[in-house]
């Protein structure tokens, strides 16, 4: 791979892992994610955003809280923008576009790029015959937390599933941030005393093991 393609693949890997670690959010939400008031109020330890449902049957929105566990922090340092009030976390997704039609096209294209590059990583780097995507990451978030014994209400709330008609009814401090950290750390079986994961230093075998954890195969 030439250096430019390696850089694009590195960024796609980061966005793919961010989708998994950010409660399985989709790229449309990732593109709109900002360093808002909650991020700074929590000392850079959490994101809060309004998740727009992608289903044609639903126009509802719900509040999602994402604890910034250590591996996610590494990803943000690698491919995220520097924290500034109300700045986009992943500005590369929309690349400054404000028109919603164009944003949708860019999201579709970026989803395709991530899928293609992740599948090349799986096949050419890991020697692994797996087909992965953003949808795969979202399903893995729910499945792996369930297998880890996390209650289904937490999983549903974390993914922005409606808890009623009130847009804020799913949150209201139902889960303190420390509980969110404890639960989301189970996504990669992280213990408090463990060192942060450095994605760039992972060997192919270590990367394969991490992806296996995402698939719930351990």
Model regions and ranges:
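Short, contiguous acidic/charged loop-to-helix segments that flank catalytic cores in large enzymes
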Residues: 2-6, 52-67, 100-110, 128-136
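Active-site/catalytic core of tyrosine-dependent DNA strand-transfer enzymes
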Residues: 69-129
